Structure formats: C-alpha cells, structure tokens
UniProtKB/Swiss-Prot annotation:
Family that this chain belongs to: Belongs to the queuine tRNA-ribosyltransferase family.
Name this polypeptide is given: Queuine tRNA-ribosyltransferase
Species of the source: Campylobacter jejuni subsp. jejuni serotype O:23/36 (strain 81-176)
Annotated positions binding substrate: D90, S91, G92, G93, F94, D144, Q193, G220
UniProt GO cellular component terms: cytosol
Active site, per annotation: D90, D270
Amino acids binding Zn(2+): C308, C310, C313, H339
EC number: 2.4.2.29
GO biological process assignments: queuosine biosynthetic process; tRNA-guanine transglycosylation
Recorded name of the encoding gene: tgt
Highest classification ranks of the organism: Bacteria, Pseudomonadati, Campylobacterota, Epsilonproteobacteria, Campylobacterales
Length: 373
C-alpha cells in the first residue's frame, strides 16, 4: 500500500491510498457488500454508475457461505464478483459476536455457532487471516475483541488486553506468511478497542501504533453509546494515532457521523445504512432524509433530490418511486440504493474538496444549515 497525506484543514485530512487494485482519495465511504455484493447492485453499478473505488465484504458471511475455498477457486473476491477495484474485508468478529446467540470469547479466539445451520466454528487471529488470504482482499482486518456498550471497566480492560494480544499474533503471522509468498500485495489494519474509556483507548492505540500495521481502525463504537460520546472518543484518540497511516472508523454511520468524524481526523468509513434504509423507503438528500411511502409523494413529479446527479434522480420522479415501493417492485431496491450510495459517495467527495480548499468549517456549517440545524 502507498499512503500519502495530501492536505489537512484542522484535523480533517485528504489522503491518497493506492492498493494493488485501485487508487482513491480520503475521506472515503466504502459501500458494504456483505456477501460479496452490495444489495441489489452488481459490479457494473458499483463501477460505472457510482464510481466506487473500494467496497467492503464480510468475512463471517463468506466464510460460512460459499466458503473461502470456493472464492479462492474463482481467483479471490475480484474474480468471483467481477469488481476489479479494491476490497476491504473485516475479520468477522463483529458478526460472530452479534449474530451468534452463544458466542464465547477467550484468549485463543471466538467460538460461535453458524446462524445458517448451527454448526460450531472458531475464529482465531491466524484463521481469519487465512480466510482473507483466500479472498485476496486488498485490506484485511485483524480479529479484535468487541464489547457492547455500556460495559464494565473490567470487561473493557479484558477486551483491550485480548485485542493487543491478538494484534501481536496477527501481525507476526502476516509477516511470516508474506515471507513464504502468501499475502503479497495484501495489507493489514489493526483495530483499536477500549469502549469509551479514555485510558483504555489510549493504551490500545499506543500499543498498536508500535506494530507495523498498514493502517489503524477504530472499532467498538456506534454500539449503544450516545453520538456525543462517540465523537469525544474519536477526538481524544487523535493525538495517539500515527499521522502517516490511514484511519478507519468501522461501521459508522449517518451523514452527520461522517461529517463530525472527518472533522476529527478519520479517513475511511463503512456502513450498511444507505442500502438498508433504501430498502425501507428512506432516502438521504442534501436537505435531510425522508420516506417515500408517504401519500404526499403520489403525484410528486420532482426528483428525490433536485440537487442530485445520480441515475435515479436524473431519470425518475418521487411519484414513480412511491408507486414502486408500494407495489413491492424489486426495481425499487436498485434505484433507491443507487441514490443513497451516490449521496454518501458525493458527500465524501464534497468533504475532500472542502478540505483541499481549507473551507471544511464553512462546509460543515452549510451542511447543517440545509438540514435546518
């Protein structure tokens, strides 16, 4: 991976990241392709309609089905999905924690039951990397020990101890595998845990900073805490993060979350919110969000967002989309997902532009003004 810090405006940053499959600027939003596809969209949509440079796929889901061996047989994620730009794969730890009713965390790894057939599995720091080697993802995430918030101080300390232990095991294993010719061209990110405990977050960040990860992620936020506490936690971490590595806030979030955390120095984001909300009829726009199922849109000839240049807004009216949603027409999911993802990707582009122009503060003011805030 090549990383260049191009410009700063306060804490907000524009960076250039080059992997084996694409070059992209940050702040960047990564659409989530949980099972190897962004829901209702294909590789052509991602490249030609949205111009996404990097997307996320989920290790837990693709490990269980179709299995990493099947994906490897197709030439990795790029050959399997035909998306030939960058892939980031998470470790699967969050899904093992959240989808399995009886997951167990111990120092060797995470034991869990498949949500598909109830079979028993064990994720370890080494095994999740082996799975991601099969995927040939451009950026691999290490296994970390996530805790739901609120959590006791003792449980947070155990989480940080375990995450540091697993990080050491993962980076040592990755370097040894690269020496054997495996994982060449693949990059590895560490994950900082610690809940909202300042000292534990600091301890975890300082420990991971000493390890030769290609980037660092902030995990374990947006899992039950108030937004203000999330923003404070990210801001407090800033002095302890290496300026010359990417910073990735995992699983976050709303448009407001992106703006607030870019202001606090975050480079990379992912979230299922744009596509999940699309399937429920909720659209993100420059003036806020609204749900298309309301009767007021039946005869509305306007585009979802007159200021938007996405395929959906260029071609279809609110009235038509209201009809498709109420008719449960599958076409709706694609059109709504295209719009919401375009909105998120365009928001990231506008933030990059504002940072480069030293006008991020004004951008943020206008962002909230359009929402009546």
């Amino acid at each position: 991976m090549e990383f260049k810090l191009k410009h700063k405006d306060g804490m907000a940053r524009v960076c250039e990241i080059t992997t084996a499959h694409s070059t992209f600027l940050t702040p960047v939003f990564m659409p989530v392709g949980t099972v190897g596809a962004v829901k209702s969209l294909d590789a052509n949509d991602m490249k030609n309609e949205l111009d996404a440079k990097i997307i996320l796929a989920n290790t837990y889901h693709m490990y269980l089905r179709p299995t990493s061996k099947v994906v490897k047989d197709f030439g990795g994620l790029h050959g399997f999905t035909k998306f030939d730009r960058s892939f980031l794969t998470d470790s699967g730890g969050f899904q093992a924690f959240s989808l399995s009713k009886n997951s167990k965390h111990f120092n060797e790894g995470i034991e869990f039951k498949s949500h598909i057939d109830g079979s028993h599995h064990l994720f370890t720091p080494k095994s999740v990397l082996d799975t991601q080697y099969d995927f040939n993802s451009d950026i691999m995430m290490i296994l970390d020990d996530l805790v739901a918030l609120p959590a006791t101080k003792e449980r947070v300390k155990i989480s940080v101890d375990r995450t540091i232990l697993w990080a050491k095991e993962a980076i040592t294993y990755h370097k040894s595998m690269q020496n054997k010719g495996i994982g060449i061209g693949q990059n590895i990110f560490g994950i900082i845990q610690g809940g909202t405990d300042y000292e534990e977050r600091k301890r975890c960040a300082l420990s991971l900073n000493e390890m030769p990860f290609d980037g660092l992620a902030i995990g374990g936020l947006s899992v039950g805490e108030e937004n203000a506490l999330m923003y404070e936690t990210v801001q407090n971490l800033n002095p302890y993060l290496d300026e010359n590595r990417p910073r990735y806030l995992m699983g976050v979030g709303t448009p407001e979350d992106l703006v607030e955390n870019v202001e606090r120095g975050v480079d990379m984001f992912d979230c299922v919110m744009p596509t999940r909300n699309a399937r429920n009829g909720t659209f993100f726009t420059s003036f806020g969000k609204f749900n298309i199922k309301k009767a007021e849109f039946i005869n509305d000839h306007e585009a979802i967002d007159p200021a938007c240049s996405c395929y959906t807004c260029r071609n279809f009216s609110r009235g038509y989309l209201n009809h498709l949603f109420k008719a449960k027409e599958l076409t709706f999911f694609r059109l709504a997902s295209l719009h919401n993802l375009h909105y998120y990707l365009e928001l990231a582009r506008k933030m990059r532009e504002a940072i480069l122009n030293n006008s991020f503060t004004q951008f943020k003011r206008n962002f909230y003004h359009l929402r009546g805030k």
